[in-house]
Regions:
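A conserved structural/catalytic subdomain of Rossmann-like adenosyl-cofactor enzymes
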Residues: 1-175
Length: 175
């Protein structure tokens, strides 16, 4: 990578984003040097024969002024197409992830633009999901779940009775 203008992308297992020891020291150096421009986490199984979830680290020795002091973190673990033997990223999936990076703004469930100070406060952990705001699922009370369950059970019983009646009328079963 050229000292002043070099850029590169490195594919790594996601563990490098949060493991301690030497990996933690390397993360700290990347953050403090402000060379880390973006992180994209991928779904497991994108790379044939490797079930481990991967990430791509984008390094840039000449970050644009608007990106300095920040890291773009993208969770692309839900942006893929499932195939029988492996998960793939179609051209459309890749374009969607690329657009998140180009837009360079936080998007709930997918992307966060994180200040270096925030990363320092979290001990240089780069686990993308700890920075991206997630949609809160509505909370349903146990009483409501129970009520809906028994309503659905009654619907199943009514459908079963109607089916039995039709089968009896058609002579398929004896009542």
């Amino acid at each position: 990578m050229k000292r002043d203008t070099g850029r590169c992308a490195v594919v790594m297992p996601q563990g490098v984003l949060f493991h301690g020891g030497k990996e933690g020291e390397i993360r700290k150096q990347l953050i403090e040097s402000d060379k880390l421009e973006a992180i994209i986490t991928l779904v497991g199984g994108v790379f044939y024969g490797a079930g481990v979830s991967a990430c791509i680290l984008f390094l840039n020795n000449n970050k644009p002024a608007s990106h300095q002091g920040k890291v773009c973190m993208i969770d692309a673990s839900t942006i893929y197409t499932a195939k029988r033997a492996q998960n793939i990223m179609t051209e459309e999936d890749i374009a969607r992830v690329y657009q998140l990076w180009q837009d360079y703004r936080s998007v709930i469930d997918y992307c966060a633009i994180v200040e270096l100070e925030t990363i320092r406060e979290k001990g240089y952990t780069l686990s993308v999901n700890s920075y991206i705001e997630k949609t809160q699922a509505p909370t349903v009370s146990p009483a409501e779940v129970r009520k809906k369950f028994f309503e659905a059970l009654e619907e199943v019983k009514a459908a079963e009775a109607a089916l039995t009646q039709l089968l009896e009328e058609g002579g398929y079963i004896n009542g």
